[in-house]
From Swiss-Prot:
It catalyses: S,S-dimethyl-beta-propiothetin = acrylate + dimethyl sulfide + H(+). At least 10 million metric tons of volatile dimethyl sulfide (DMS) are released into the atmosphere annually by the dimethylsulfoniopropionate lyase in oceans. It is a component of the tangy aroma of the seaside and functions as a chemical attractant that guides various marine animals, such as sea birds, invertebrates, and some mammals, toward potential food supplies. DMS oxidation products act as condensation nuclei, causing water molecules to coalesce, with possible effects on local climate through enhanced cloud formation. Changing residue 265 to A: Abolishes dimethylsulfoniopropionate lyase activity. It comes from the Eukaryota. This is Dimethylsulfoniopropionate lyase 1. The keyword Lyase applies. The gene is ALMA1. It comes from Emiliania huxleyi. Changing residue 108 to A: Decreases dimethylsulfoniopropionate lyase activity by a factor of 75. Coiled coil: none annotated. Homotetramer. GO terms for molecular function: dimethylpropiothetin dethiomethylase activity. Belongs to the aspartate/glutamate racemases family. ALMA1 subfamily. Induction: Highly expressed.
Amino acid sequence: MGNCTSHPHHEPQVHFDTVDGMATVKAFAGIRQVTMGVLRIDYEYQTNLGDILDPRSFDFRIISATAEGLTFAKAKAGDKLDATGKELLERAVRQLIDNGADFIVGDCGFLVYWQVMVRDYAQDYAQKKYGRKCPVMMSSLVLALPLLATIPSGGQIGILTASEKSLQAVQKKLPIVIEDHQKEDGGQRSRSVPAAEDPSGIMINFSDPRFKVVGLDEVKDFKHALDAQGADAVNDRRDIAVQIAAYCQKVQEKNPQIAAWLIECTEAGGFAWAIKVGTGLPVWDPITLGRFLSLGFTANVPNVALTLGQHGENPLDPSATTAGKGRCTGEEPGQIHALGAEFQAIREGTL
């Protein structure tokens, strides 16, 4: 690494070549890893790379808990949960938080029906027992509204789902499910916003011309994989990848205004790469959702240490560095920029 000059009032100065590297490694290794909690429906399926439950899909810790009795059929239908169903759902949420979940996502897009319920359970329990917050995003559909800001005027976001008919039904039933929860809860934990106007912070309006709901019902091998499950679920995922990419390309040719794809179905997330390559468009999916939430808990300490001045008050002069990222240009003699006191303590082994 090249050398650069620190501002004279930044003391003490640190020379990386005199630092005990292993002490630093041990300090950073002691930082707790980000943990994602996955709320599962009562449904067994074969996980694959790109699925929300496959540990290879992420570079952080994953734990899961099942909402017993909440089957795929019930989730898809948005059926009202009885007292026992709600108790089992809340139990699963508490289990995730007790096991260290920093945030919670769902393993089925139709869990969006219980976004408000799970969010309220999580925030209430995490705050009362541990004095912390626990963000909840049950479905990648929560990304629909902010993604509208990324597309050009007249453009569309293609929303990929396993069943177009079932997803269209969400728009009608979601406010009802949320209103039932708010009434029974007495408004104690739910935000005081009419569900029909602001359902859990998720603005779902598929009649909006900026959305194009695309069902994967016609992709035979994918449908078979969903219906069969078990050993016969997937003959060759490469065939499914090609079929989905070709189908999306076909839809895109008929709807050239589609500027991006949002995958709602968690089991289709593993084919995001094929859609990106096949259509040439950006793709967001359930994996994107998990990674997005994880960033709120990721301390990018090495970068912070190199780009901030003592106590984080004085950033390096961007004009004296490459790309304004605090990297030394190699032209300045002297010493590396002084680290903040907290990072100095880490290096000296006093923290």
